[in-house]
A protein has these predicted regions:
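Short catalytic-loop micro-motif centered on adjacent basic/acidic residues
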Residues: 26-29, 51-52, 78-80, 104-107
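C-terminal hydrophobic helical "lid"/dimerization subdomain
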Residues: 86-138
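Short, surface-exposed acidic/glycine-rich loop or hinge patches that mediate macromolecular interfaces
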Residues: 11, 34, 83-84, 109
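Adenosine-nucleotide cofactor-binding segment
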Residues: 1-39
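Glycine-rich phosphate-binding loop and adjacent beta-alpha segment
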Residues: 35-99, 135-138
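Short, surface-exposed connector motifs at secondary-structure boundaries
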Residues: 19-25, 45-48, 99-102
Length: 138
């Protein structure tokens, strides 16, 4: 499992996907949501699945959405929504983390004054792990 390719959305994303997979891909994880949903269907192969799990595009709904028309034949639409966990669920998660000594991989630490540099490192995707910004001011 995993990704064979990483593509940048440069306004030619669907064309680039179809150049690598002419029949389309089996699954699309849509993080921008309704804003790009119809376009994302174009990247799917027959019987492919589009999963919407975010609204990072800022558009929460699709006006005049008609599933009969807007979901192409032989393609599937599903979603994933993560609601606010209960205190009990959070306690369970933290017990698991502590019990199994799970620790994040920290690539670099920066002071608040170095936040510009931290942002550049994050944007360049050259580090494996978390970029941590520490506020030493009190």
């Amino acid at each position: 499992y995993g990704a064979s390719y990483a593509l940048i959305d440069d306004d030619n994303l669907i064309t680039n996907i179809l150049s690598l997979a002419p029949e389309g891909v089996s699954k699309v994880l849509e993080l921008l949501g309704p804003l790009t949903m119809k376009e994302s269907f174009k990247a799917l192969q027959k019987h492919g699945t589009l999963c919407i799990t975010g609204i990072l595009g800022g558009q929460e709904t699709i006006e005049k959405f008609d599933p009969i028309i807007d979901i192409p034949n032989d393609k599937y639409l599903t979603s994933f929504y993560s609601n606010y966990p209960t205190q009990e669920k959070m306690n369970e998660i933290f017990r698991y983390i502590y019990k199994n000594d799970i620790r994040p991989i920290i690539a670099d630490k920066y002071s608040l004054e170095e936040i510009g540099k931290a942002h550049s490192v994050t944007e360049n995707n050259k580090k494996l792990g978390k970029i941590v910004v520490i506020n030493n001011k009190e």
